[in-house]
Amino acid sequence: MKPLFPRRFLIASAAAVMVLTACGGIDPVVPEAAFTLQLLHVSDADGSDSTALNSVANLSGLVQKFRAQYPQQTLTVSSGDNYIPGPRFNAAYDPSLRALLGKEEVGRADMAFLNALGIQASAIGNHELDLGTRQFASIIKPDGAWGGARFPYLSYNVDFSADSEVAGLKLANGGNAAEQAGKLTGWTVVHVGSQKIGVIAASSPVFANITSPGGLVFKPAMASGEVDVNGLAAEIQRGVDEITAAGINKVVLLAHMQSLTIEKALASRLKNVDIIVAGGSNTLLSDANDVLRAGDKSAGDYPYQTQDAAGQPTVVVNVDADYKYLGRFMAPFDAKGVLIPQRFDSQLSGAWATSETDDSAGGVTVSGLVSQVRDAIKAVLKAKDGNVFGKTAEFLEGRRAAVRNEETNFGNLTADANLWYARLLDPTVQISLKNGGGIRSEIGEVLAMPGATTAAVLTAPKANAEANRLAGEISQLAVETSLKFNNKLWVFDVTATQLKTLLEHGVAVLGSQGRFPQVGGMSFSYDPARTAQTLDANFAVTTAGERIRSLKVGTDVVVQNGVVVGNAQRTFRMVTLNFLAEGTSTAAGGGDGYPFPATANFVNLVNLETAMNAATAGGAASTSTALLGSEQDAFMKYMKSQFGSTAFGVKDTPPAQDLRIQNLSQRSDTVLN
């Protein structure tokens, strides 16, 4: 990390900040900063539970340290995805958390972290809505001894009025953030010393397809598979204009777009937005003075500087997820509220790395509540890491950049587990389809030595002596972490034509998309240079896809040279996730935009939760801790049955060697050979 006591701190106090920012050989015609805002920001605590829990205490100390240096100049925000369903999230329901939370309930430990960090406003991320608006409301609003969020959640481009769970939490735009704890609004005012800062947020319209937003309406609506950036900018601009009309000349946008490309595009399309805090993409921006964690690589400059639609300076900032970094931007404004780029200070601003091994690293004093809640959650999780289901001798590749772009050994393994599980009840099931976005983390270790210039070493899970778990053993905690959503499994028939359409959708939009397929019982090739399938707002095909070149189910050739061969109406029995099949309450098709038919039209549908209960787990060979008929149950039982004594031993391969999913820009087509 950057040293906490750079030379300028040894000779200066917070009161001298404007004098200091004038130093360093700056052209004398550059105006002095009339006000310098210290913006502290976090987001995306949605990846590794271990990383987040081991980092949050040290981050709390950094926040307190920096806030104490500039107590009348600091704004602390999050750009969303502050939690995600999974072990850490669920552990807050344990009665041992009652004394700390007031009332135990899932997700509330994460909210307690944010409260202790002093977050003053947050964007709504997609993961806030993964369990629906009722659960979201349960986390942010008071409930008996539970105090709820101590800050407002913001999203200007969301209409909350049609959702009964959260409509009552919505306040008019433009109130005082300090008086809006546990409420929802489009934009708010944060009083920072003598200054008023307008804070507005926006949530990606794609949320309607990738999470469970209930009756929430996102603007502009998704008319295709792409976000209408111009329409989104126009929507946000209306809110920004409201802020400036109220006499506020400093504006921060919390943009949870899941794509830094979109956030950069918004920067040049909007007027009077000074700072955009990006969210959802886990992108690490940094400057030359930042010392990154071992193995991490910068994705660009902190801050990203450009001009807005009126030619005024604006910036985009973002840091990596899971409390690994605290973003800190010292924003010098002139008397008119315009940023002064010549006075940006890269020694103070940037990505400040936290420590996973030393809570007080850098001489900071951590928040007592953060460390207490952290320790209580870790105690709950520790018990789960000793409950073992199978073994692996290899790193199971479940990282976002892999499972959303290519076949991986973990993608194959969990797809195979679902297929094996479905066949316990129905031996005629032939194929398994799931989305890469449903795999939330790897199972194994990523080892990188400080200062290393070579790739990190990937290994099977290391031993945990505290939990009495041996190296290579796969625990309940690992399964719950990597398959956090624990979707239910459905079985039904699809035709040859429908199967090609589904796979065309999976590869229609590339580049770390949650829709990217992981499959079992079949193999296919695709050419990303060919025409992509497009869908209308009702998920009907408007442009036929030409990317799927070969497809084989067992020995049955389904697609050859891009064309369905044989009887196009012949059927294949498929197991898939209920999320993909039935989607969300606001999407006409399936989750991640999959063009499944409406539930009533599924042929020979079997819900494995119901079927497994009726058959007393279908004769599965072991007992798991997960819901019957779920993907966690399938994976635990499959691993115990197939790899309980002999470890799984298939290494992950690069795209050029992948066999189930062959990317023809990386290799030749051997699917039908």
Whereabouts are the PLM-identified features?
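Bacterial N-terminal signal peptides that target proteins for export
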Residues: 2-11
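Short amphipathic alpha-helical segments with coiled-coil-like heptad repeat character
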Residues: 2, 284, 426-428
